[in-house]
Amino acid sequence: MFDLLRELGIKSFSFRAITDNAQVAETVKQCGVDRIDLSGCHVDYDDPASQERVIETYRAAGVKITGIGVVQLKDDEAFNRRYFEFARRAGCDVVSCSFQPDGYESTLRITERLCDEYGMRAPIHNHGGAHWLGNATILDYLFRNTQPTIGLCLDTAWCLHAGEDPVKWTERFADRLYGIHFKDFVFDRKGKVTDVVIGEGALDLPALLKAFAAAPFNGSAVIEYEGEDAVDAIPRCVAAIRRLI
């Protein structure tokens, strides 16, 4: 059973302004957690030597890498393989992804093969109402036409941005939920979004955590906060979640 109290982590994109991975690891631990989902701003997928240094930096700091992404997959097996190779060496099995509509079927067949080969899961990240993978209809279609290794990386705030309900998504896609970005927005009258401490915006955090606890989850569960005050805000996000567990 997934223990969110202990296994909650942080999406490294939240700390994209910090380029030194040792400092990122230290900041993660200062937030009261010891897990991270690595974004491309903190790893070079074309440089295996630097990748090993990244992995060792987090290992030495006692910070577990629970996933990577969001990576942009293509209809190109060699290109996509780089991500799975890194994930295997990093000791995680979640490669959150996105891809373009052109050639999507071939991209997914390649991804399924790589998941099987590497023992990975590739959850699709929903990125708001303007993104073609940001609505439940297309996600349901894709899940019905792919192997179970293809799932959902639920970004709760971007789900809200699409006019959808992350609580219902958590329930509907429970069996394919392999990643979650706990994130919250407030919306102004024109629909412009601002990151806020989770639970202080449009997200029904108590209902989400109840649905999450009922799901058979075993993946990468992280807080993501994209505001410039992330170092100050994320400890409050951690506390907000832990108060309700």
Where are these regions (language model features)?
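Short, acidic/turn-prone active-site loops that include or flank metal/cofactor-
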Residues: 41-42, 128, 182-184
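Metal-dependent catalytic neighborhoods of phosphoester/phosphodiester hydrolases
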Residues: 46-52, 77-80, 232-233
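Acidic/polar N-terminal loop/beta-strand segments that form early-domain functional surfaces
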Residues: 13, 39-41, 70-71
